């Protein structure tokens, strides 16, 4: 297990940089794929995702700390006052650099020819290691395996949800892993299957509040077992600086995001989220999990804020308009290839103990899919909510429906009639959650 942190944590091993041979091989493959896509009438809109990134101008010898101070903060537009449209925003001002190799095109888009997106469900009562592994294996098998997602030698990143920091505790004596953060046994099970599929390198990533989140919440032990590298996305390690990654087609709030370069250099990106309600977004699953991709320091209204307050804006009203759009923009900039949602033991009424209505619930369920929008839609329905609900209605009581925005952006489908559920039905696993309305 390797540790890559914003802090001065010792580093056992750094991920390899692309060799010239690998660069040429991947560039050639990308060019061939583009040529093929141009010849195919039904090419997915996601083929344009992960556009060229531009590095900041910090010297290559800079440390993570100096890189952070030299990287210009991102700019965002004012909150739109009408439904989302493809309006222009302020162009990025980062210094241009040679084009980076694009990541693999997501396989999570609705299939052509009327085929429905598939989402797998598994009923499971606890986090017993063998049972979790068997459940995840069964779901992956029902989705056709990982062969169309992970290819031999691929570099794969798993984004976990470790929100809030270790000072926060679970309700009623439950651990955070059994309430508001991704359970490590779910990460372990998927990681083992990814390695079985031939992955050449595995990374577990999150913009953690502190490194202790990895240690105390089980990911450090899982990374050691898997031979994976842990990376704190708040910093630049193991690279000299951040990259600016464009939002394909532009965004309504942000035109680009500042990322740790690992998010661009990987071949496959997976989201392992917790099944929860959310104060601003209504629900938080695979798509919302990507809020934790960006370094918090660049997305604060004031330096004193510990969270990404610039995403929210000054009020709940602005947050309800901004955050759903930003969720979609992040998913366009860094698409998800495979989504897994931990709903075995979780919380209702809010995303964490800082929400007054937060409390425990044990649905005993897992969800998986290659269409992250569909996967989130099924999880939302299993919470007793309508994934197509209009803005300002339950569960999206404070703003826009980010599932609808994601579907409109071509990231997947949120309509249950367009989704084929594998395993138990939604009604079989449905457990009505208290929404975050207090």
Language-model regions, residue ranges each:
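Ser/Thr-rich, Proline-interspersed low-complexity disordered segments
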Residues: 40-113
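Secretory targeting signals
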Residues: 1-18, 30
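Residues within the helices of the helix-turn-helix
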Residues: 21
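Intrinsically disordered, low-complexity regions of eukaryotic proteins
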Residues: 8-11, 24, 53
């Amino acid at each position: 297990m390797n540790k890559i942190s914003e802090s001065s944590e010792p580093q056992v091993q750094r991920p390899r940089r692309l060799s010239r041979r690998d660069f040429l091989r991947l560039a050639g493959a990308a060019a061939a794929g583009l040529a093929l896509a141009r010849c195919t009438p039904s090419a997915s809109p996601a083929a344009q995702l992960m556009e060229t990134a531009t590095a900041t101008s910090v010297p290559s010898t800079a440390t993570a700390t100096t890189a952070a101070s030299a990287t210009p903060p991102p700019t965002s537009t004012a909150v739109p006052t009408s439904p989302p449209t493809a309006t222009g925003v302020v162009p990025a001002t980062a210094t241009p650099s040679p084009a980076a190799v694009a990541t693999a095109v997501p396989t999570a888009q609705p299939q052509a020819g009327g085929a429905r997106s598939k989402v797998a469900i598994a009923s499971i009562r606890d986090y017993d290691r063998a049972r979790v592994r068997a459940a995840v294996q069964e779901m992956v098998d029902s989705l056709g395996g990982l062969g169309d997602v992970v290819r031999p030698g691929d570099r794969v990143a798993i984004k976990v949800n470790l929100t809030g920091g270790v000072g926060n505790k679970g309700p009623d004596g439950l651990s955070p892993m059994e309430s508001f953060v991704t359970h490590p046994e779910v990460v372990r099970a998927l990681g083992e299957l990814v390695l079985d599929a031939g992955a050449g390198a595995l990374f577990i990533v999150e913009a953690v509040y502190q490194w202790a989140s990895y240690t105390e919440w089980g990911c450090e032990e899982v990374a050691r077992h898997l031979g994976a590298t842990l990376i704190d996305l708040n910093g630049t390690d193991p690279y000299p600086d951040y990259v600016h990654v464009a939002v394909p087609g532009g965004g309504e709030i942000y035109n680009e995001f500042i990322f740790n370069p690992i998010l661009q250099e990987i071949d496959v990106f997976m989201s392992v989220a917790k099944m929860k309600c959310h104060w601003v977004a209504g629900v938080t699953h695979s798509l919302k999990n990507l809020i934790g991709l960006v370094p918090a320091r660049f997305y604060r209204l004031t330096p004193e804020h510990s969270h990404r307050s610039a995403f929210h804006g000054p009020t709940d009203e602005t947050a309800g308009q901004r955050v759903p759009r930003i969720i979609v923009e992040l998913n366009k900039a860094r698409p998800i290839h495979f989504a897994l949602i931990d709903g075995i033991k979780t919380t209702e009424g809010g995303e964490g103990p800082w929400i007054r209505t937060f409390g425990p619930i044990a649905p005993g369920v897992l969800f998986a899919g290659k269409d992250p929008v569909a996967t989130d839609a099924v999880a939302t329905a299993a919470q007793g909510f309508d994934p197509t609900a209009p803005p300002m209605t339950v569960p999206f009581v404070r703003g826009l429906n980010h599932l609808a925005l994601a579907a409109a952006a071509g990231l997947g489908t949120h309509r249950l009639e367009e989704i084929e559920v594998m395993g138990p039905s939604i009604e079989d696993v449905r457990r009505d959650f208290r929404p975050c309305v207090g």
